[in-house]
Amino acid sequence: MQFPENLRYTSEHEWIRVEGDEAFVGITDYAQSELGEIVFVDVPTLGETVGQGEVFGSIEAVKTVSDLNMPVTGEVLEINGALDAQPELVNNDPYGEGWIIRIAVKDAAELDNLMDAGAYQATL
């Protein structure tokens, strides 16, 4: 399983990669392996500001549906359109082409509430 060092992680198994004032958000390799085959990603919050820890969407696998929680407060700027036709990208490349949303980070200090790769791996 992969745990990239350049990301921050939530206890709910989301990751965030910050690039300036924006960030990409997805689910971890562990989360996708636990969920199994991803069949649909639903993010109804495009254009909305969602608080840290709040639900911004859901992810549906063959066997279950799980909420997606915001790692930091941010405005949802973009949803990964490739997931409409290929939701399995979340399984195949969770930290790359399988990203779920791009956000405008509202409070970078909230990143301090998240785990680094080592701390996240220790929770599994």
Annotate each language-model stretch with its function.
Residues 1-58, 88, 92-124:
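Acidic, low-complexity mobile loops and tails
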Residues 7-10, 67-73:
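Short coil-to-beta-strand transition motifs
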Residues 22, 73-75:
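Structural motif
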Residues 37-38, 63-65:
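A short beta-loop-beta micro-motif enriched in histidine and acidic residues
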Residues 61-64, 81:
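Short, conserved catalytic or interaction motifs in soluble domains
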Residues 63, 69-71, 95-98:
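Short connector loops at helix/strand junctions that flank enzyme active sites
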Residues 76-92:
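Short, charge-rich, low-complexity interaction segments located
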